[in-house]
Amino acid sequence: MNLKNIAAIVTGGASGLGGATAQALAAAGAKVAVIDVNVAAAQEMALKIGGVAITCDVADADAAEQAFAAVAAALGPARVLVNCAGVGNASRVVGRDGPTGLSGFEKVVRVNLIGSFNMLRLAAAEMSKLDALDDGERGVVINTASIAAYDGQIGQAAYAASKAGVVGMTLPIARELARYGIRVMTIAPGLFLTPMLRSLPAEIQQSLGDSVPYPQRLGMPEEYAALALHIIGNRMLNGETIRLDGALRMAPR
């Protein structure tokens, strides 16, 4: 897909993987909607790339519908959706005070899995009504999972489950949407230098980077963005999850 003047939505687009992707899409000629719960950061990113900023809880059905309507009004209907919005927590199933509460588990699954599906379903419905481009293509959806979907560590039950759900829905949805010319892909990043990791002490960042076989460092958000753009440009990539992790396999803890 040629991205020039194509409307694209990036959730979690104010920073990190989403921020790098929003910038890369804009540099490729796309009209980008930055969706994020951080209003100020979303506005700053939108101003930087010449896009629009929209505040939205991705797991809220009504808010998401309003966000898509706002994007269509400002940029036209989107042919590209990149889901980068996500949260994480660390909690053992059984702790010193007994079983962990459900609220933390529910929040992570709600944002990471339900939020991704919510945005995908609305994007797909909109894309299915658009005129077909080359090869009958109408749109591309890229979800973000994690290597935790495969190598979840102790304390990552909620996060790993939510990301495994994203991986699990990729193929069946891609098969379903194939009739419309809509592709669905997922990227499963390893250890990337996102705002969360940037907040850690330098020695911990170095230790985490050293655990990656090659390249022996943390991934850069721009490398995620580069893969997202490659997926958009290569129509044979469909229904698959790509690990972007430098051959890293996480230890139990």
Region roles according to the model:
Residues 3-32:
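Canonical Rossmann dinucleotide-binding motif of NAD(H)/NADP(H)-dependent dehydrogenases/reductases
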Residues 88-106, 125, 129-135, 155-158, ...:
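Conserved mid-core segment of classical short-chain dehydrogenase/reductases
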